């Protein structure tokens, strides 16, 4: 994955994680998962509800926060 993709993903997911914002994650097959983001890396998101699930990013279609989240994107490398 390119660094440009990480410029949006990482700050967004990190804000959701730090602020303990409940999220709905829709997978490409239509399944809806709900919980809080516990952790993430380049390939997976750990989603905590009654159990912790490892969700591969390539299977994720959409991440919908339960409320608005402010996050900062470092756009100094943008042209």
UniProtKB/Swiss-Prot annotation:
Disulphide linkage map: none
A GO MF term: RNA binding
UniProt cross-references to InterPro entries, sorted A to Z: Hfq (IPR005001), LSM_dom_sf (IPR010920), Sm (IPR047575)
Stretches assigned to the Sm domain: 10-69
Xref: CDD domains: Hfq
Listed GO CC annotations: cytosol
Coiled coil, from the record: none
Matching Pfam families: Hfq
Similarity comment: Belongs to the Hfq family.
Protein's job: RNA chaperone that binds small regulatory RNA (sRNAs) and mRNAs to facilitate mRNA translational regulation in response to envelope stress, environmental stress and changes in metabolite concentrations. Also binds with high specificity to tRNAs.
Protein name: RNA-binding protein Hfq
Organism: Cupriavidus metallidurans (strain ATCC 43123 / DSM 2839 / NBRC 102507 / CH34)
Gene: hfq
